[in-house]
UniProtKB/Swiss-Prot annotation:
Domain of life: Bacteria
Name of the protein described by the UniProt record: Pyridoxal 5'-phosphate synthase subunit PdxT
Organism from which the protein derives: Mycolicibacterium paratuberculosis (strain ATCC BAA-968 / K-10)
Alphabetized Pfam families for the sequence: SNO
Listed EC numbers: 4.3.3.6, 3.5.1.2
Subunit comment: In the presence of PdxS, forms a dodecamer of heterodimers. Only shows activity in the heterodimer.
UniProt family annotation: Belongs to the glutaminase PdxT/SNO family.
Primary gene name: pdxT
Database matches in InterPro entries: Class_I_gatase-like (IPR029062), PdxT/SNO (IPR002161), PdxT/SNO_CS (IPR021196)
Amino acid sequence: MSAPRIGVLALQGDTREHLAALREAGAESMPVRRRGELEAVDGLVIPGGESTTMSHLLKDLDLLEPLRGLLADGLPAYGACAGMILLASEILDAGAGGREALPLRAIDMTVRRNAFGRQVDSFEGDIAFAGLDGPVRAVFIRAPWVERAGDGVEVLARAAGHVVAVAGIEPDA
């Protein structure tokens, strides 16, 4: 069995770090910036960054609708921070004036952008994470939280009483 080919959306965020972590875990990893690259992967990581900027880059590069289609067809995806925001079905405080964060609608959840406050309110701390033996060190920089998790969405972690990590569960799983 060959290693899965996992793409990392390379528009913003920790692209190199995600690519290296995937390789270390045994996956074949590649940056994704074009439609052909998107269509060549078995899964996708959407890193952190600025969700409105990432949304408009996806749109400008003609990746938004193809990505929505692939996700609707079951492409596995992981989203960190802005990536989690974009994977949501609904985004609160999405922006205005043509610079809104655009939901990919991959997970039935409502996410609030910048929920923990402004840059000056950033913090880090240890959080319990479902399925892991010990706490995970997490960094929250203008971070989102999940306001609503729909049916088929498993809550994985909370911080300061708010859901900060989820998994969308396939109906067949």
